[in-house]
């Protein structure tokens, strides 16, 4: 039931005309959804720094991870052309307490992420692409979606040196972090804050730039 999920129809000055996307997000299974002015999507070069320090396994190894995505500067210029964004969240059954090296059981971050949060990661990806399509069909043909974390649609990404294209281009999307979006500040601006290292369920967060 939509009434049992958290919906933030408007935040800031996001136009009422776009509330159909919030309703659609909840209908499609989002735990929470909110509209916000695109100017409240926070971009910070330090987010990309955290892709490299400490280095993420996806860095330079995945098509939708840095440095293979658009630069932070290019994304910031592109973001300036948008006025409305939709932020969505998919809640996990697990909390966000940190795991130390021993708690990881010798597994890589990618393996652990797929094992612990794979269902939510894939659910968020499907949700974002469906909402992007809904916005497109409604006439907002510049709609563009972003997910969270490393893409796990394939067991492993294509060999970048081969020049082969993405195997699932209609489903794969870059993470918000990959283009420099500060997910925590942006979620807070949307009225859907995320708490780090807490006993609250992990909230996988995605974004659709609408118009």
Question: Where is each model-derived feature located?
Answer:
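Auxiliary alpha/beta "docking" domains used to position bulky ligands
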Residues: 2-211
